Amino acid sequence: MNPFTSNGSFTYSLSASYPQPFSQYSAPLRHIITRQQYYPDHRCISKNESDFMAMNRLLWMEHVNWTRMIIISIVFQLPDLPFVQKRLLQNATDLGNCLRPFYGNQIADAYAQLIKEHLVIAAELVTAAVKGDTGTVNAKEKEWYENADAIVLFLSRINPYLSKDILKEMFYTHLELTKNEAVTMIQQNFQADIDVFDEIETEILSDLIASAIVMQFYSLFRCPYSF
């Protein structure tokens, strides 16, 4: 396949390289393949931007992975629970540190605290669900969504490139999928649980947040070969 048009512009779609139907691929792979579009031209991406995007993807992947591990530890009462919880909360510190060079210590620490609350409430919610404590489940779910609203408002205020509505929709989807993941695990519906986690992997917020930071501080990420 020739990826160049007659006028020399680059117009290549990744999806064209993979045999259809796309239903044969897992959800994370489908997400990457099908979201690709034809671009009239290519864009130079600096190593700084590439590394920053990769770092954020890794940290949000750790976010959903360690959340899954703590759900497993709570549901099946595994002895590794305190160790898993400690490692999970490190993710909040790491995500805060991602903001530190751009927004300073106060904003970075505040963001880390909001993410920590998000993770702690999630663990408390799953614990209550396992015990069948409906009252606590309802209270913690309300608190969880209030925390999500606080995170969305916080990020949209510090970065004008983050749409509050889009961010809220994505974060609420993240909460809903995580809740479904816990429910299917508690019910020991393991295939459904795996299917939900596949969807969770496609919904991580890393690219949305990291791309907005790149746009806001573009001088720090600008490709040296751009004209």
Describe the predicted segments one by one:
Residues 1-39, 227:
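Acidic/polar low-complexity scaffolding segments in large eukaryotic proteins
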Residues 8, 19-26, 49-55, 59-74, ...:
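C-terminal amphipathic alpha-helix
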Residues 42-45, 70-81, 96-107:
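Helix-loop segments that flank and shape redox-cofactor active sites
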Residues 67-70, 77-84, 107-117, 122:
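Early exported N-terminus immediately downstream of N-terminal targeting peptides
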Residues 87-109, 113-115:
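A glycine-rich, hydrophobic loop/mini-helix early in the fold
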Residues 96-103, 107, 122-130, 152-155:
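Membrane-helix exit/interface motif
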Residues 111, 116-119, 125-144:
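All-alpha RGS (Regulator of G-protein Signaling) helical domain and cognate RGS-like helical scaffolds
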